[in-house]
Amino acid sequence: MMLIKNIVTLDQLESSDYLYKLISSVLPSLCLDYKIDPKLANGYVHALDTIYSPELISILTDGERSQQLDTLGINYILSRKNDLGIYFPINIRENGEIVSTWNKNTGGYTNPIPCTISFNDLPPFTKILIQIRTMGCEAHARYFGGYVEHPSSPNILSPKINPNISFANSYIHSLTYPYIEGRADYSTYRPLLINGIMEKKDLANLLNVRALLEPMSRAIFDAIFKIQFHCNANNIVLVQNPNIDTDLITMQTLKYLVMYFQHFSGFTLRDIYLGGVRIRVDNSMLASYVVSIYFSKEIKYIEDNKLFSLDYIDQFVFRPDNSNLNITVTAQQLGIRILNMTSNRPYIINLLNIVSKSLVRHRNVPKEISLFWDGMSYDEYKNMKFIDMMFLGTTCYLFALYNKNGITYCSMLNDVLRAEETPIRICVFPRILKGKTIPTLIREILENINNISVRDFPKYDTHDVKHIGLSDAGFMLFFQFLRLMENKEPHIAVKEILMAYTGIKIDDKGSPYYITPESYRTFIFMLFKAMGFNVRVNRTTISSHSYTSYYVSPRVSKRYLTNMLQKASCSQSEAEKLLSSAHDLVSFMLSVNNSSNRDSYRRINRSFFGGFKESASEEDATLVQFISPVNILDRINVKGILSANALNEIMDTDVFLPENANFKENLKQLLKEDTIDGKSIAHIIPLNTIDRLIVSAGGVSVGELLENLDERVPDENATNEVIELITNALKDRNMKDSNFIATNILNSITQISEKQMDGIKKITCHGTMMFKELAMHIYFTERYFKAKISDDVKISILEKYRDFIELSKSLYKDLIGIDQIKSVLSIVHRTGRNIDDNPITQEDIQKAYNIARPKILKLTNYYTEMTKSYFENIKRIMNPEDANAVVFDNE
């Protein structure tokens, strides 16, 4: 069994630092087809956070959120008593605002294993909950977190803080709803307003309580709650002086008297009778009688089950009107327990209401055990695969429940293990980022990398306009005219350029000159600048590509050009004729943002990739983007590598520091703009990380990091070829000229071989997608339509795919063989040597070729392993009966 104490976690990192480390270090260790546990798609947040941050709602399942809110409402009401207040450090204000009163008070139960993590990446109430959980006892955290017990949940050892009551209710909704009628200094009742009109249920309650009040209090009551207005709005006739029975023995229900003592005791009751006799009694004694009679069953249930500790009195005392003698009725005579309502009347009534509803409503039961609260057994955790254990440790906070001195506590798993305590349960808390759990984000990233994007396989738009209708000579003449244009008013510049173009076009002959990608950028900049457009340039690096963005404003449109011509004294008809005469040029101008060639120019709508955030005025601009791969020397940390003199120094060097630094900044930008999702992150991941992920996914060994050192260090980074080249150069700083040339030849050949391999991989993946689609059609035909396709068809397809791969490999070897000859002459020319003066011997050429051969062989071996995995995947999809009829050739 592995050493559990060595499990990898990223607990101390947060925000972009955490995300960067996760993607750059952990993601490459996962296979592309790594299956993430569906249970991790949802996580945990305190339900109060979802009230103010709706994007967090998706973290919880619908049932889990509603049940948690139900329990939180109950626990909040029960905690308004002093001895429970410290266990629910939240206060809901009159306007529905929820504020924290957390002051690190754990009620005397201090966790013996302290936690050093700040949890600043968590929403506010979730952060408080985690602090309570890691600083106090588990029961405290469950009370504040709205824990709902599952029938199979393991028991915990801790002081009993609450009776674990949970049923469907709207307490939190009512307490936090901001649109209410009334004033808190007169009543705690919160009648809800919908579109400014009081709900009928609340209005009915108010009218029944109003009938119990004496006239002067009734008038104040009407003014505070706007009774007349809401009665009219609800089509209810208001009785100004209601006549009701207020005899405690004969009145229809005590409900509204109970409600009076719960919310409206600041108003004055009308005369109260008992057996036809008007009585004089103070409010606390009357409340004791009314509440005890109304909740007699609930009081007995509380006593029988020892749910709460209530205070009682032995008798009910009142005085008949016009009498000096008190009459006493004992609890024994009434056959009930009489509550002492001298203090805390609203709280006691709320408590009894909760117990009453719990007896008649269905108890909340979660569908499954909670990973956050109940977790998994320690043995189950220890028996997990290492990759699953590492994934949990880096994408989730891992807590451990443990018992100490008869109390159950919860601390970080690593802290518990270091303290040499034995965990009883491992609780999993998926980390959250911008409304998603990190496991969900990783799944999206893997899916987007699996789904081949335009970045990996360029799609050329056949509708792009790459010419302006002029021949080579005509284009150069027009280009020179643009260079000579001085700064002029936009309307004048537009007219002069269109007229000049039309004049050149009349005498121009020959086929159109197609603008090369190298000239395109310069031409559109000069064209729009000369026409008076404002061209703003932004440059940034995304993934391993350089993005140059041109914002041309105002937006290029035919309407704008027409307006400029009319402003330059052209009539509507003249403007249309001039635009028609310059049709090819105008079409080119209108199509500049339609290109989609990855290595040339294309339009991306996301403002992030322009290097800045668009303002409202820039929405009316035309965006053109030029995208090109970053040179390999600009991607690597040349200074760091060259300054390393030992193996350990090279291993500690961040080889791809420049593009990793750009990646980290791009992550910060995504977080700042709230555009975090799998697609956006997959787009900005640098190629050195993508290379490692793809290689790992195929299970391929990519050779050694340092080929010519005695200690051979394996690495999974295909892009790390460049490290080997630079390290070889470091071995001997006084190389002979011939060795220097040979090393440079190797550099050139390796880069060329990688470039050619990229082209072959793209061709292969395009072909593989067609074969895979064909295999999927066969799969669905057999699976869903129950039609049997013979093995001959399946084997024929596999043989064709194998032949396709062999043809691609043969083409690659031919390309490298020819490029090798070119590279030799190119390197000699760049070093300033003359072949006649410094002849290169056959021995030098042979040495360069021998060094290059294993590099090329390594790439072909990697390609073979990759295509073999594709071949096996297609075979598995089609599932021929004779699986050995055709096999993949590893040679």
Curated annotation (Swiss-Prot):
Where is it localised?
Answer: Virion
Please provide the record's keywords in A-Z order. Answer: Virion
A Gene Ontology term for the protein's cellular component: virion component
Coiled-coil parts of chain: none
Report the domain of life of the source organism: Viruses
In its keyword annotation, does this UniProt entry include Disulfide bond? no
Pfam families assigned: Pox_P4A
Q: Mind listing the GO molecular function terms for this protein?
A: structural molecule activity
User: Which family does the UniProt entry place this protein in?
Assistant: Belongs to the poxviridae protein P4a family.
Complex formation: Interacts with P39/A4.
What is the recorded function of this protein according to its Swiss-Prot or TrEMBL entry?
A: Core protein 4a is the most abundant virion protein. Major component of the virion core that undergoes proteolytic processing during the immature virion (IV) to mature virion (MV) transition.
Protein name from the UniProt record = Major core protein 4a precursor
Source species, please?
A: Fowlpox virus (strain NVSL) (FPV)
